Structures are given as C-alpha cells and as structure tokens.
UniProtKB/Swiss-Prot annotation:
Keywords recorded for this protein, A-Z: Chromatin regulator, Chromosome, Methyltransferase, Nucleus, Repressor, S-adenosyl-L-methionine, Transcription, Transcription regulation, Transferase
EC top class, as a word: transferase
InterPro entries assigned to the protein according to its UniProt record, in alphabetical order: Hist-Lys_N-MTase_N (IPR041938), SET_dom (IPR001214), SET_dom_sf (IPR046341), Suv4-20/Set9 (IPR039977), Suv4-20_animal (IPR025790)
CDD domains named in the record: SET_Suv4-20-like
Example of a GO biological process term: methylation
Gene3D superfamilies tied to this protein: Histone-lysine N-methyltransferase (1.10.10.1700), SET domain (2.170.270.10)
Presence of the UniProt keyword Endoplasmic reticulum in the record: no
This protein's name: Histone-lysine N-methyltransferase Suv4-20
Species this protein is from: Caenorhabditis elegans
C-alpha cells in the first residue's frame, strides 16, 4: 500500500480521544511532539512554541502556510479527517512518515489528534499566547479553561504523554538549553520521565488549579479548584523547580503575594528586581 493510501486510511479510522498507552521511544516522542506542535499549535498561535530540537526546521514556509489554512478550516468546521489528512500529506511530514514502520504511523497520527483536541469546543480548554515568563522571552503559551470545571473533574481531552528515561536518554535530551521543561522526576518510579503532549503547555503556579495524575505511559489532568472560562490550567512543578524555595518563580500567585521573583516589591514600590544567580537549568519538576 502506498503511503498516501495509508495516510488516507488512518485519517478515517481513529479515536478523537487516543488510547492512553503507546510504544514511542523517548527519541520518537521528541520528534513526534515537535512535528505536532509545529503543525497544530504554532500554525494557530503564529509563533514557534517549545521544541525539543530547536535547530531543526520541520516545515518549509509554503507548508507552514498550508498548515495554517488547514487549522483555520478545522477550527471552523471541526472536520477531523480533512485536518489529519491535510497535515500528514504535507511534503516534509510525508517524507518523515515514509521512514516509519506502519505501527508508528498510528502513533504519529494519535499524537496529532491529541493536539487537535485543543481546538474542539467539547474539550473545555484551549491554548493561548502567554507573555508572563522571562525564561521564554515573554512569548510562550498557556492552557485556559473554556468551560466550567468542578473540583475532582478529569479534563478528558487533555493529557500528557510519558516516557521513562535512561541516564543516556536524559543526558541527550537535557543537552539542549531549555529542553528541561519536558522532564519530570517520578518519585514513585525513582527515575526521570519525558513529559510531552498537550499537557506540557501547562504552566506552574504555587496555588494550582489542577494536578497531574500519572497512569502508565500517559498522565491526565484532575481539577483541584473550580474553574470558569478564562481561568488558566496550572499545576505545581515542585518547591525547588525555580531555584531554592522557588526564588525565581514568576507565577500569578507569586506576583499577587509578592513572593518568588516578585519578592523585591515587598514594602518598596520603587525597588529594583533582585537577579538571583542563574543556573543553566532549573530543577526537575516532580510527580508521584
């Protein structure tokens, strides 16, 4: 069967909420995620969001324009099949897929579907530009609620994809500056795990609205505090993620309480920011 026939078939036979298990290796997940964020997220936000391989170009300019058109149509018409087929038949994507075994075509397609869920009304959330964080040059992304959520709810169409990392994998993945956003330490498994997928866009807050719940090779998001449309979906990365006692934390709660990176504001409106000694890496965020 020719590749385009395979793409046509997998664009029809799919679940709009992909299975929670997967067989991706850490390297495959990095490439699949970079492609998915380029095709789906970047083409909507119109800037480059986080990437595991920052020097790689995934699409040519004409393909990027096509991806933007595909995503615009998807957001208007919610036609999953046309969106999947339109994205997977782009030259650069097809060339990448031609090197994969058949079972990995399904894995790649499912990863695209995870991100397409960001723009489905039923998902109850979406992605928006975020200019809060200096580590991102004040141009990043955030996930926000588009519906009403109650404590204990599971955000069904929002997930993270998890891969266990060997020490060799960890050294390779963390070699690139800024790629540590994607790595968490599992206290239960006592090892580092690669954390990508839509859930990787969840920002930290010291008073989070949600939490990560791990189950096997994925993690879902559970609501901790009631949310209404416009509320940001946030999780707690850890007490030392942004330096000792999160001294460099720039979250909304720290700004409100004048803690973390905003502690210089206490009692002195004219004070200058205190620049702590910067490390090349933040600490790994933790999960159970």
């Amino acid at each position: 069967m020719q590749l385009h026939e395979q793409i046509a078939n997998i664009s029809v036979t799919f679940n709009d909420i992909p299975r929670s298990d997967h067989s991706m290796t850490p390297t495959e997940l990095c490439y699949f995620d970079d492609f998915a964020t380029t095709l789906v997220v970047d083409s909507v936000l119109n800037f480059t969001t986080h990437k595991m391989s920052k020097k790689r170009r995934y699409l040519y300019q004409d393909e990027y324009r096509t991806a933007r058109t595909v995503m615009k149509t998807f957001r208007e018409q919610r036609d999953w099949t046309n969106a999947i087929y339109g994205l997977l038949t782009l030259r650069s994507v097809s060339h990448f897929l031609s090197k994969l075994p058949p079972n990995k075509l399904f894995e790649f397609r499912d990863h695209i579907v995870r991100f397409l869920n960001m723009f489905i009304l039923d998902s109850g959330y979406t992605i928006q530009e975020c200019k809060r964080y200096s580590q991102e040059g004040h141009q990043g992304a955030k996930l926000v609620s588009t519906g009403v959520w109650s404590r204990g709810d599971k955000i069904e169409r929002l997930s993270g994809v998890v891969c266990l990392l060997s020490s060799e994998d960890e050294d390779s993945i963390l070699a690139q500056e800024g790629s540590d956003f994607s790595v968490m330490y599992s206290t239960r498994k006592r090892c580092s795990t690669l954390w990508l997928g839509p859930g990787a866009y969840i920002n930290h807050d010291c008073r989070p609205t949600c939490e990560f719940v791990s189950h096997g090779s994925t993690a879902h998001i559970r609501v901790l505090r009631d949310m209404v449309p416009g509320d940001e979906i946030t999780c707690f990365y850890g007490s030392e993620f942004f330096g000792p006692n999160n001294i460099d934390c720039e979250c909304c709660t720290c700004e409100k309480n004048m803690n973390g990176a905003f502690s210089y504001l206490r009692g002195n409106e004219n004070a200058e920011p205190i620049i702590s000694e910067k490390k090349t890496k933040y600490e790994l965020r933790s999960r159970s």
